[in-house]
Amino acid sequence: MSTVYETLYILRPDLTDEQVELAIAKYQNLLQEQGATDLEVQNRGKRRLAYEIKKQRDGFYVQFNYNAPGKAIAILERAMRLSEEVIRYLTVKQEVTKEKEDKVAVTA
């Protein structure tokens, strides 16, 4: 059973563009290995933080939207928690609107 999730995470500002791309690819591959589908990646770029986090004032914002089983979230968040490149992350379960449910039912 897959659920629609959105994960937003912030990477350290001192990473190079290549390191940012590698980090995005690492978490993208991790999700795909855990059975995530319809993965959309949005690199929102470097932005100023509203307040200081881990002595950082800026960060690279990255957003994932995807369908995945619940166990994939725990694995993804554990990897982010242990990583030194991620300074903050948040995963939320998306509400599926009635229109999308009807569209899924028609295509199935």
Swiss-Prot record:
Binds together with bS18 to 16S ribosomal RNA. Keywords: Ribonucleoprotein, Ribosomal protein, RNA-binding, rRNA-binding. This is Small ribosomal subunit protein bS6. Belongs to the bacterial ribosomal protein bS6 family. The keyword Cell inner membrane does not apply. GO terms for molecular function: small ribosomal subunit rRNA binding; structural constituent of ribosome. GO terms for cellular component: cytoplasm; ribonucleoprotein complex; ribosome. It comes from Nostoc sp. (strain PCC 7120 / SAG 25.82 / UTEX 2576). The keyword Repeat does not apply. The lineage of its organism: Bacteria, Bacillati, Cyanobacteriota, Cyanophyceae, Nostocales. GO terms for biological process: translation. InterPro entries: Ribosomal_bS6, Ribosomal_bS6_CS, Ribosomal_bS6_sf, Ribosomal_S6_plastid/chlpt, Transl_elong_EF1B/ribsomal_bS6. CDD domains: bS6_chloro_cyano. It holds the Pfam family Ribosomal_S6. PANTHER family: MITOCHONDRIAL 28S RIBOSOMAL PROTEIN S6, SMALL RIBOSOMAL SUBUNIT PROTEIN BS6M.
